[in-house]
Swiss-Prot record:
One annotated Gene Ontology cellular component of this protein: plasma membrane
Membrane topology classification: Peripheral membrane protein
Record's subcellular location: Cell inner membrane
Gene: atpG
Protein name per UniProt: ATP synthase gamma chain
Function: Produces ATP from ADP in the presence of a proton gradient across the membrane. The gamma chain is believed to be important in regulating ATPase activity and the flow of protons through the CF(0) complex.
Quaternary structure and partners: F-type ATPases have 2 components, CF(1) - the catalytic core - and CF(0) - the membrane proton channel. CF(1) has five subunits: alpha(3), beta(3), gamma(1), delta(1), epsilon(1). CF(0) has three main subunits: a, b and c.
Transmembrane segments: none
Family: Belongs to the ATPase gamma chain family.
SUPFAM superfamilies: ATP synthase (F1-ATPase), gamma subunit
Amino acid sequence: MAGAKEIRSKIASVQNTQKITKAMEMVAASKMRKSQDRMAASRPYAETIRNVIGHLALGNLEYKHPYLEERDVKRVGYLVVSTDRGLCGGLNINLFKKLLADMKSWSDKGVETDLALIGSKAVSFFGSVGGNIVAQVTGMGDNPSVSELIGPVKVMLQAYDEGRLDKLYIVSNKFINTMSQEPLVVQVLPLPPSDDGELKKKSWDYLYEPDPKSLLDTLLRRYVESQVYQGVVENLASEQAARMVAMKAATDNGGSLIKELQLVYNKARQASITQELTEIVGGASAV
């Protein structure tokens, strides 16, 4: 019965792992709902700032903020949003693959790249594969704040202000639904052109003081910060959804493995009983 005992031990081990993955699945589901609430709460703020900036730019054609103007591209920057923890399927690696493809397309044109990394997985990945890392932040937890993101954002905006960067992108996962998350590389600077016709059709009830220039200087920075924060909360919701799905798959696979081991155990036990009966019958015949 040594073989049967060993199989029983394996079954118990898989059952214990199943309990862990089931608990992690339930925790991820709870955290995902909270992340979705934060994601929904931050979205109107980012969209409103985008509309106000678009209206200001349209209403004051004499002044063009540097963040609104295209220029020759010699170096681009990426604010990369990853997770701090693993066990979330291919969420991070799919994001990194998309980023590397985008970086290669710029590299083929002779354009250099800078990286500002958010999340320990990005820090670990680009620490291994290489890359010009100019800023990083990790350990933000499940309730990130804008203040924690100021460091990397400030570094990239300063580089853009000084002409060391000509484009700035945010790289993160967009939460679509529980089963689907999409890796995105989104340009934030210079501000991508919007549908001017749509903005002109809207009714605006704002009076700006002191002047559009002063407001643009502040609002454009707030806009970039809000887009990075939105990327972080969407990535967090994507992380929890991916982890929930991964842990459910692990739990289900554990159930299938237990059934297979149970079948092997039954066969081993049957073989052992058959052997014992054969020995008993053989002994009786000898007497």
